[in-house]
Design a protein with these regions (language model features):
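Solvent-exposed adhesion/ligand-recognition segments of exported proteins
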Residues: 1-237, 244-245
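Extracellular beta-solenoid/beta-roll
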Residues: 249-251
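Short, intrinsically disordered, charge-balanced linker/junction segments flanking boundaries
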Residues: 256-261
Length: 261
């Protein structure tokens, strides 16, 4: 994994060579996205057009096929601030940003990726090199006032010990899984486990200015106390809203669904 920049100064990450399963696993001391954005370079062609940085050079680490999943894992001690767009250059690939110290998305969005996972869990690969599990023991994921734009993606997954929505989250299919869990990314199984540190008061908290706007919304809140608290708007325009919670569900806002709750 090496860092370059486009002609206009936007950072370009030349992602690590993918393994046999097509997974590029990148480790960072810090991972932040400033408002101009960051490009994840999955390009094998000589010159590739990007929305954020114009024409960029191909990634020298990609001697064979491009990646189909790009994992960005933070191994340092600082939380991540995502304040701009993350663009995959070249062939589309799923994007995972994992930071156990926490993540704040405040004006973040994603380009040229079919599915995005933001998590405070540790990515675990199986024997074949595919992403098997996210191991969540700590960390909060916050959506700030400038929101999260997942409208270009088939799905957006937020997987953390606690999730706080202070802004709007837009997507086609949104899945929020909160609590200390081992979340199997291949089977969908969610297995509760002992977390680190204090238990958050609320697993999934949507403030008055926050909200989720998507075709289909699934919320899973595990842990003691309040599982899901909504003071904002949770609306599924095309499909259903599914809420599963170990704790209480408190709703002082609005939850609406085209088909069913």
């Amino acid at each position: 994994t090496t860092l370059n920049q486009a002609g206009n100064g936007v950072p370009v990450v030349d992602i690590a060579t993918p393994n046999g399963a097509g997974v590029s696993h990148n480790l960072y001391q810090d991972f932040n996205v400033a408002p101009p954005g960051v490009i994840l370079n999955n390009a094998t062609g000589q010159l590739t057009q990007t929305q954020l940085g114009g024409l960029i050079q191909n990634n020298p680490h990609l001697t064979g096929a491009p990646a189909n999943v790009i994992i960005n894992e933070v191994v340092g001690a600082n939380p991540s601030q995502l304040q701009g767009y993350l663009e995959v250059a070249g062939q589309q690939a799923g994007v995972v940003v994992a930071n156990p110290n926490g993540l704040t998305c405040d004006g973040c969005g994603f380009i040229n990726t079919p599915n995005v996972t933001l998590s405070t869990g540790k990515p675990v690969l199986d024997a074949h090199g595919q992403l098997q599990m996210l191991d969540v023991k700590q960390g909060a994921l916050t959506v700030g006032g400038k929101g999260l734009d997942g409208s270009r993606q088939a799905s957006v997954d937020l997987i953390a010990r606690a999730v706080q929505l202070n802004g709007a989250l837009h997507g086609k299919e949104v899945n929020v899984i909160a609590g200390a869990n081992r979340v199997n990314r291949q089977t969908g199984e969610i297995r509760a486990q002992q977390g680190d540190g204090a238990v958050p008061e609320v697993a999934i908290d949507t403030a008055a200015m926050g909200g989720m706007y998507a075709g289909k919304i699934t919320l899973v809140g595990n842990g003691a106390g309040v599982g899901v608290r909504n003071a904002g708007q949770i609306g599924a325009s095309a499909g259903e809203v599914v809420i599963g919670s170990d704790g209480r569900i408190e709703n002082s806002g609005r939850i609406s669904s085209a088909t069913q709750l």
